[in-house]
Structure formats: structure tokens, C-alpha cells
């Protein structure tokens, strides 16, 4: 008997009817459901990233956090931080388009590390997200992926917390300070 493959919308509709524990984030990665707990250190870094974007681009910067966005290959993510183009508009279904994303940052947790470094990185490269930043509070490092081509990132920079990350060459007029990122 053939199984019926559900669309992302159908999967998310089913998730909305399920009792998801409070404080958990739910995403669909390559058609599989992942739940991960939100932690205070995780949120503290996200807040610092959003503030850095607001400080540089103003309070009206088009930035989202934990908002569902659909990506190629049955991936429905809620990036920790996503900066969209100033002229980005929602599609006919009322959703933001991944084609308008200029920058994504994911702060890993123990439960999301494999996904953030693997399938999510691959999906973001396939979607040609220009800048993908992985912040790892467990080892105190940031991984910057840029130059997406043919489904892969062709540039990778690793820096320790405390090192500034200049995103200008990657197309975003921002130098990100990491010296106050907390470690877990």
C-alpha cells in the first residue's frame, strides 16, 4: 500500500492540533518533525543578534525570529533570526518567501546541532541564502557560510566568540560583535 505524502501545510496543520510542550520550537526538516527546547542562553544570543541588526539598520529593519518559512525539499523552518530585504513582501498565502532572505542565524542547542550544521545548512545553500551564521554557545564559536552555489556554500569562516565578524564582503553592511555572546 502506497503512503500518501503530506505537504508542508498539511504537516503544520497537524502539528497545530498536537499538544506541543510549552517552551519548545517545532520545525520540519526534510519532511521530519523536530522539537527543541528554548533555553535562556539561546534566547540571549538571539536577542543580541536582533539588536545588532536594529542598531545598524534601524528599528524598522525587516527581521524575523521563529517565524515559519518554507524552503525547498519539504523543509519548513522557523529560523532563530532572519533578515529579509527591505522590499520583501508576503506571498499569496501570507508567508514570507525564502528568496527575500539576506541573512539567517541559527543558535544551536544540543537537540538542533545536527540539523543546524547538516540539513538546514544544505537547505539554506540550496535556497541560495547569501549568509548563514551558526552560533555555537557550547564551544564558543561562530561559523559563517557564504557564497552559495549549486546547493553548497563555497566559503566557510570559523571564529571564536570575542572576534568581530565583518559581513560586508558577503553583502550585508554589518560588523557583528560576538564578545558578549554567552557560553553554555
Where are these regions (language model features)?
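Gly/Pro/Ser/Thr-rich low-complexity, intrinsically disordered segments predominantly at protein N-termini
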Residues: 1-127, 131-184
Amino acid at each position: 500500500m502506497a503512503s500518501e505524502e503530506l505537504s508542508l501545510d498539511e504537516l503544520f496543520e497537524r502539528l497545530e492540533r498536537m499538544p506541543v510542550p510549552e517552551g519548545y520550537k517545532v520545525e520540519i526538516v526534510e519532511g521530519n518533525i523536530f522539537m527543541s527546547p528554548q533555553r535562556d542562553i539561546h534566547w540571549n544570543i538571539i536577542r543580541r543578534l536582533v539588536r545588532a541588526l536594529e542598531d545598524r539598520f534601524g528599528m524598522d529593519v525587516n527581521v524575523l525570529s521563529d517565524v515559519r518559512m518554507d524552503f525547498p525539499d519539504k523543509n519548513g523552518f522557523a529560523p532563530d533570526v532572519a533578515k529579509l530585504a527591505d522590499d520583501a513582501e508576503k506571498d499569496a498565502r501570507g508567508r514570507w518567501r525564502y528568496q527575500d532572505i539576506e541573512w539567517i542565524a541559527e543558535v544551536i542547542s544540543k537537540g538542533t546541532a545536527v540539523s543546524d550544521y547538516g540539513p538546514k545548512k544544505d537547505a539554506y545553500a540550496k535556497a541560495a541564502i547569501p549568509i548563514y551564521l551558526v552560533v555555537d554557545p557550547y564551544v564558543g564559536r561562530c561559523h559563517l557560510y557564504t557564497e552559495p552555489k549549486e546547493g553548497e556554500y563555497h566559503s566557510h569562516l570559523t571564529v571564536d566568540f570575542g572576534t568581530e565578524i565583518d559581513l560586508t564582503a558577503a553583502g550585508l553592511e554589518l560588523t557583528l560583535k560576538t564578545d558578549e555572546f554567552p557560553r553554555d
